């Protein structure tokens, strides 16, 4: 156990956390797309991240499926999430052993818009992971936060990486 979890704090997620979470989400039939720092990393750009960011379809049924999957985390922090929270708030932060941010919309793009706008499925350790395409990630970075500056400056790198 690392120092953060010894103090009851969340630790930075690692790739195996992402794989485990996506395995659980898939088992529950949850509709989600990986966005944010891990998505950027999977496209080949170096980026640190403190959370796993998921764009989720915001229906009550799907949020319940997401919560069941998040219930595999040790502190069961997802039990505190109401079914309508993803529709009511910009970001729903589930701070368990790791932090998972749930978004119903990202820069005006909801789950259906993401599916239409470009999602690819990557297999990680045998687990299919729906991942925002490079183009979709750039569209989602239309708003600039301080921690996004390296990604925003590197947005042209996505264009150069296109197949």
What label would you give each PLM region?
Residues 1-163:
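Compositionally biased terminal segments of proteins
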């Amino acid at each position: 156990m690392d120092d953060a979890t010894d103090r009851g704090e969340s630790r930075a997620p690692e790739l195996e956390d992402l794989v485990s979470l996506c395995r659980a989400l898939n088992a529950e039939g949850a509709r989600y797309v990986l966005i944010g720092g891990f998505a950027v990393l999977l496209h080949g750009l170096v980026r640190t991240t403190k959370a796993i960011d998921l764009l989720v379809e915001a229906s009550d049924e799907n949020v319940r499926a997401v919560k069941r999957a998040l219930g595999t985390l040790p502190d069961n922090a997802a039990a505190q999430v109401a079914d309508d929270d993803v529709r009511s708030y910009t970001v729903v932060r589930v701070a368990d052993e790791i932090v998972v941010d749930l978004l119903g919309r990202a820069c005006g793009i909801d789950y259906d818009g993401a599916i239409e706008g470009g999602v690819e499925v990557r297999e990680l350790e045998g687990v299919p992971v729906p991942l925002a395409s490079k183009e979709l990630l750039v569209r989602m970075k239309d708003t600039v936060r301080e921690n996004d500056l390296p990604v925003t400056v590197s947005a042209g790198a996505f264009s150069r990486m296109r197949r």
